[in-house]
Regions:
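Acidic, proline/glycine-enriched N-terminal capping motif
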Residues: 2-141
Length: 141
């Protein structure tokens, strides 16, 4: 490593405070995208309420962060006409909107503080296992 390399800032280096605000949580409940026109029409709102309830006591992210999300979806989220399940972008939109009410509520620009995002979905065998696993780690950009 040259002296010039030593002076270059790390793009995603942890801040000294970052280790205090690492969030690793599985939000229990069935993830939903948007409002439903048939079936259990209250289910998306119930999911939003669960996200807010289960994340409201967590530390607030105020600066840049990295986020990883894994949606844990029950079998009925994978019907024959959608064998890969619901769209990730739609699942993520509702989740991030809800997190803007809790852990991202003090971040300038709301969820724009997320500088790196990894998202996936996987099928679980029951409603009891369903939810969303989130990891959030503040970084210096």
């Amino acid at each position: 490593m040259t002296k010039a390399d030593e002076r270059k800032p790390d793009l995603f280096s942890l801040t000294p405070e970052a280790s205090m605000f690492y969030i690793n949580l599985t939000i229990k409940g069935v993830p939903y995208c948007k409002m439903k026109s048939r079936g259990n029409q209250e289910a998306p709102q119930k999911w939003s309420e669960e996200v807010v309830r289960q994340t409201s006591a967590l530390p607030k992210i105020k600066d840049a962060c990295i986020m990883k999300v894994t949606f844990l979806l029950p079998p009925d989220k994978y019907p024959r006409d959608m064998p890969y399940g619901p769209d990730l972008d739609n699942l993520l939109k509702r989740l991030l909107d809800d997190l803007k009410r809790t852990i991202l509520s003090e971040a300038r620009g709301g969820d724009s503080c997320i500088v790196s995002l990894t998202v996936m979905k996987t099928k679980v065998s029951s409603y009891e296992e369903s939810g969303a696993h989130i990891e959030v780690m503040p970084v210096r950009v």
